[in-house]
A protein has these predicted regions:
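Metzincin-family zinc-dependent endopeptidase catalytic domain
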Residues: 62-148, 152, 156
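Metalloprotease/metallohydrolase-associated module, dominated by Zn2+-dependent proteases
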Residues: 2, 24, 28-32, 117-140, ...
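N-terminal Lys/Arg-rich, disordered targeting/topogenic segments
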Residues: 1-10
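Disordered inhibitory propeptide/activation segment of secreted metzincin zinc metalloprotease zymogens
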Residues: 12-60, 69-70, 74, 108-125
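Short, structured coil/loop segments at alpha-helix boundaries
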Residues: 54-62, 87, 141, 176-179
């Protein structure tokens, strides 16, 4: 009987510990999601400006990206440099720390109505890498590169007409301000 009580007691301790861990994880994850939803810029790069790599391909417009980078530079968000023709071995890498990588998407990577999508990797509140995936040809649309670089810099959507970070393309504009 003593061995059974010991096993039963260990089982209760294990379940209580597991329950506490799951509860703590859930509360932490919920707090992180709430922070992301409520913040205009929940994450940012550290003091080293990111490097932008064109892994989309040679048909990506260098002029369009340079214009988009300039849009953010005049607002105080810097890029280390832009590499229009990086080596293929670099483009084969995923989640390169310190880089914003531009890629051509395929029909499985983007929803039907999505022109481009930016994914950020973070450590704490610091962005470590970002990847912008474009629907083929959408990089030529006015302001799309500026908008996606905004996400790569850590900004979320702002549902105010004329704002560069508006989620709907037809309501996007050249304006940038931090919402109240």
């Amino acid at each position: 009987m003593g061995a059974r009580k010991k096993i039963h007691s260990r089982g209760k301790t294990f379940l209580a510990t597991l329950g506490s861990l799951l509860l703590g994880f859930s509360v932490g994850l919920g707090g992180k999601i709430l922070y992301e939803v409520k913040s205009f810029q929940p994450y940012s790069w550290d003091d080293n400006p990111p490097i932008v790599l064109n892994c989309y391909g040679e048909d990506f417009s260098e002029l369009q990206m340079v214009r988009a980078i300039d849009y953010w530079v005049v607002r105080g968000y810097n890029i280390g440099f832009y590499e229009h023709n990086p080596p293929p071995t670099v483009c084969e890498q995923k989640d390169l720390m310190g880089f914003i990588i531009l890629r051509k998407g395929n029909h499985r990577q983007l929803d039907e109505s999505t022109l481009a999508s930016t994914k950020r990797k973070t450590f704490g509140l610091v962005i470590t890498s970002a990847e912008i995936i474009y629907r083929p040809g959408s990089f030529n649309l006015d302001l799309i590169n500026e908008h996606e670089l905004g996400h790569a810099f850590g900004f979320n959507h702002v549902e105010e007409a004329g704002h560069i970070m508006h989620p709907l393309y037809h309501k996007m504009g050249k304006g940038f301000w931090k919402p109240e």
